[in-house]
Amino acid sequence: MSEQLVTPENVTTKDGKINLLDLNRQQMREFFKDLGEKPFRADQVMKWMYHYCCDNFDEMTDINKVLRGKLKEVAEIRAPEVVEEQRSSDGTIKWAIAVGDQRVETVYIPEDDRATLCVSSQVGCALECKFCSTAQQGFNRNLRVSEIIGQVWRAAKIVGAAKVTGQRPITNVVMMGMGEPLLNLNNVVPAMEIMLDDFGFGLSKRRVTLSTSGVVPALDKLGDMIDVALAISLHAPNDEIRDEIVPINKKYNIETFLAAVRRYLEKSNANQGRVTIEYVMLDHVNDGTEHAHQLAELLKDTPCKINLIPWNPFPAAPYGRSSNSRIDRFSKVLMSYGFTTIVRKTRGDDIDAACGQLAGDVIDRTKRTLRKRMQGEAIDIKAV
């Protein structure tokens, strides 16, 4: 699934204007150079856009009036709009965000010492992981840079306007929402560059996390493009189980996937030498003590910490959530091998905002529901 590289020439809107949210700093400087302006003007505008969540050129008071007028003629700052908001009893907020005639979902998760934003990268998902609600919606398209960074921009603007209520500013971003980020590299990477940029959101590379189910060629590319924290959606201790619940494993098996992870760690400073393993706990599928021993053996050569995720149900799902006692036994086995093991606290499940529950509103170009009814046919995933 290849993507055209984003440039100022291919990010114009219907009215011929360039949405500046589609441009990272290098592209923004090229844009201002083409306007006959000095590169530092790009830095000024980005600071207004991301430090102050400003989308009105007239409010950028350190930019001269002539340039502001020129910008209004050729450019705009247009983030996708929130069309629905749901608030959980635990403080989690889920926003449905309009992207064209469809919706993706973005989740704000406040904690005592941080606030994490879970961001979507695609409308739907093509990977068909059996335990994930997003995967059941099918796949429509990749999100543009402006639609990815626009989720962060919109959330930051909402949270910033609500400081009087005590909401914590966003400190962490995780690419764990709808979609597989590595199948949209050419939009995800510039968006993450803006998250890290001092004139963007200025986040530490250790506080921006990309999660992948294992698109190995793209993971190798990622290591040459950007350094961010990495989480891998493993979810199984062997290929037999993973083939069933994470079908991309049939193309890139666990051994191949973990080898790519180790290659990424060799290039990365953000991960401090270890990767986060995500492992959803499915009752009597992958949660037995024998599975824990297999997982420990599997990961012995991969420096990591392990997040055990109680499965979050959705309608018509064929699984059950592991009991607390089974999760506890599983965790103790892993810790006996010396692995740092954390049982993730479920957040936002009362508003379907928890891990694996995001669905949005997807016009399915893969016609997945129809195919499943008629043929049970699996989608073909092309390498990036």
Swiss-Prot record:
UniProt keyword annotation of Electron transport present: no
Name the NCBIfam families on file: PRK11194.1, rRNA_mod_RlmN
What remark does the entry add? Reaction proceeds by a ping-pong mechanism involving intermediate methylation of a conserved cysteine residue.
**Source organism, top-level taxon:** Bacteria
Give the record's cofactor note, including how many are bound: Binds 1 [4Fe-4S] cluster. The cluster is coordinated with 3 cysteines and an exchangeable S-adenosyl-L-methionine.
Its recorded reaction(s) are: adenosine(2503) in 23S rRNA + 2 reduced [2Fe-2S]-[ferredoxin] + 2 S-adenosyl-L-methionine = 2-methyladenosine(2503) in 23S rRNA + 5'-deoxyadenosine + L-methionine + 2 oxidized [2Fe-2S]-[ferredoxin] + S-adenosyl-L-homocysteine; adenosine(37) in tRNA + 2 reduced [2Fe-2S]-[ferredoxin] + 2 S-adenosyl-L-methionine = 2-methyladenosine(37) in tRNA + 5'-deoxyadenosine + L-methionine + 2 oxidized [2Fe-2S]-[ferredoxin] + S-adenosyl-L-homocysteine
This chain belongs to the protein called Dual-specificity RNA methyltransferase RlmN
Name the HAMAP family on file: RNA_methyltr_RlmN
Boundaries of each Radical SAM core domain copy?
111-350
What is the documented function of this protein? Specifically methylates position 2 of adenine 2503 in 23S rRNA and position 2 of adenine 37 in tRNAs. m2A2503 modification seems to play a crucial role in the proofreading step occurring at the peptidyl transferase center and thus would serve to optimize ribosomal fidelity.
* Coiled coil, from the record: none
Cysteine pairs bridged by disulfides in the record:
C118-C355
Q: Which family does it belong to?
A: Belongs to the radical SAM superfamily. RlmN family.
Does the keyword field hold rRNA processing? yes
Active-site residues are: E105, C355
| Positions that bind S-adenosyl-L-methionine | G179, E180, S211, S233, L234, H235, N312
Matching entries from InterPro entries are given as:
Aldolase_TIM (IPR013785), Methyltransferase_A (IPR040072), RlmN_N (IPR048641), RNA_MTrfase_RlmN (IPR027492), rRNA_lsu_MTrfase_RlmN/Cfr (IPR004383), rSAM (IPR007197)
EC category name: transferase
The gene name on file is: rlmN
The protein's location, in the record's own words, is: Cytoplasm
Residues at which [4Fe-4S] cluster binds:
C125, C129, C132
